[in-house]
Swiss-Prot record:
This is Elongation factor 1-alpha. The gene is tuf. The lineage of its organism: Archaea, Methanobacteriati, Methanobacteriota, Methanomada group, Methanobacteria. InterPro entries: EFTu-like_2, G_TR_CS, GTP-eEF1A_C, P-loop_NTPase, Small_GTP-bd, T_Tr_GTP-bd_dom, TRAFAC_GTPase_members, Transl_B-barrel_sf. Residues 136-139 are annotated as: G4. It comes from the Archaea. Residues 60-64 are annotated as: G2. It comes from Methanobrevibacter smithii (strain ATCC 35061 / DSM 861 / OCM 144 / PS).
Length: 413
């Protein structure tokens, strides 16, 4: 079967109890991607679709990223249902960096929460340039237009601060549970004349596929499949991989010929950016590669950094960041502790101009140029050359302390 429609990866972001999973579940139902009988009865029937993992069902929280597909007349979508609880922000980071567009879910009865702000900021830093805002649970505020407008103003102000133009962002009153304005216009919001959620999704611009950039596939998992062998799984970020080509995994160093490529249980001869694939490489075993490795062509291998220069924004740090600080950097699918070697310059966050050379410390709200050294080999690349491989978030003490972009790499070899 040929791949015909263009494909969009969609991240659902927002505060934990604002109804992301329920909205995704109802969207999948309306789009015909799941049957009614797959749903539980009662309050949480739509969320169940996304929360397949047993542990999640017990806790009632979405933990891992659930890749779900649905289609409209225009596009094929893969939903990256991004977890909302604070300790899962790092999942969101690896999730959001895989998304072409974001749906920000804000509950009408609860409004903008601190986490809402953090998710908006991170998604912009991690490369989401298209946004749809779903004002959810509109049924709980009696479909009140004034309440919707109040929230629209509040969220507009928030997204403007990180560089979205509110005029380009659809704001949609929805009820994830009742189904208002998901597929069809709801009679309960006769005051609303804009698109439904599915119409707004079809108005997104398909991402231009970075096919001319070098091949990069960050590995999410490695499986052993009977009759096939070792199957690394990941999303093609850039470039094109064809069956029969030789690829190398860095920093592991393992290489071999691509024997097969599979996506959603179908085999393909090639894989392009945006494709979530499993593939098999001759001579590469399960113990040779792991999550966080990156596959590329042998003649243009992913860069392993000895150290790198970066531009960061400190989002929230209870103290100060100084030389020697060693938090965990989350870049594509890798998580590696990196040490701050030098604080090169503090920047004016409004203009990006240097405000102070070699500052003694950085604190919440500061933007800066820094030099860091990974404590073990990791792939990270200049964000100007390969943006998908140059974005990262910095985590410490169970929270995201900073986010940034790699601007130069000193290669390890």
């Amino acid at each position: 079967m040929a791949k015909t429609k263009e494909h969009i990866n969609l991240a659902f972001i927002g505060h934990v109890d604002h109804g992301k999973s329920t909205l995704v579940g109802h969207l999948l139902l309306k789009a015909g991607a799941i049957a009614e009988q797959q749903l539980d009865d009662g309050e949480n029937k739509f969320r169940f679709v996304m929360d397949k993992l047993g542990e999640e069902r017990e806790r009632g929280v979405t933990i891992d990223l659930a890749h779900q597909k649905f289609s409209t007349k225009k596009y094929d979508y893969t939903v990256v249902d991004c977890p909302g609880h604070r300790d899962f922000v790092k999942n969101m980071i690896t999730g959001a960096s895989q998304a072409d567009a974001g749906v920000l879910v804000v509950a009408a009865d609860d409004g903008v929460m601190p986490q809402t702000k953090e998710h908006v900021f991170l998604s912009k830093t991690l490369g989401i340039n298209q946004l749809i805002v779903a004002i959810n649970k509109i049924d709980l505020v009696d479909y009140d237009e004034a309440k919707f407008n109040e929230l629209k103003d509040e969220v507009s102000a928030l997204i403007k601060t990180v560089g979205f133009n509110p005029a380009d962002v659809p704001f949609i009153p929805v009820s994830a549970f009742e189904g208002d304005n998901i597929k069809d216009a709801s009679p309960n919001t006769s005051w609303y004349k804009g698109d439904t959620l599915m119409q707004a999704l079809d108005n997104l611009a398909a991402p231009e596929k970075p096919v001319s950039l070098p091949l990069r596939i960050p590995i999410q998992d490695v499986y052993s499949i009977t009759g096939v062998g070792t199957v690394p799984v990941g999303r093609v970020e850039t470039g094109v991989m064809k069956k029969g080509e030789n690829v190398i995994f860095e920093p592991a160093g393992a290489s071999g010929e691509v024997k097969s490529i599979e996506m959603h249980h179908e085999t393909f001869e090639t894989a392009e950016p945006g494709d979530n694939i499993g593939f098999n490489v001759r001579g590469v075993g399960k113990n040779d590669i792991r999550r966080g490795d990156v596959a590329g062509h042998v003649d243009d291998a992913p860069a392993v950094a000895k150290e790198f220069d970066a531009q960061i924004v400190v989002l929230q740090h209870p103290g100060v960041i100084t030389v020697g600080y060693t938090p965990v950097f989350h870049c594509h699918t890798s998580q590696v502790a990196c040490t701050f070697l030098e604080l090169t310059a503090k920047l004016d966050p409004a203009t990006g101009q240097v405000a102070e050379e070699n500052p003694d410390f950085l604190k919440t709200g500061n933007a800066a140029f820094v030099k860091v050294k990974p404590t073990k080999p990791m792939v990270i690349e200049n964000a100007k050359k390969i943006p998908q491989m140059g974005r990262f978030a910095i985590r410490d003490m169970g929270q995201t302390v900073a986010a940034g972009l790699c601007i130069d790499v000193t290669p390890a070899k």
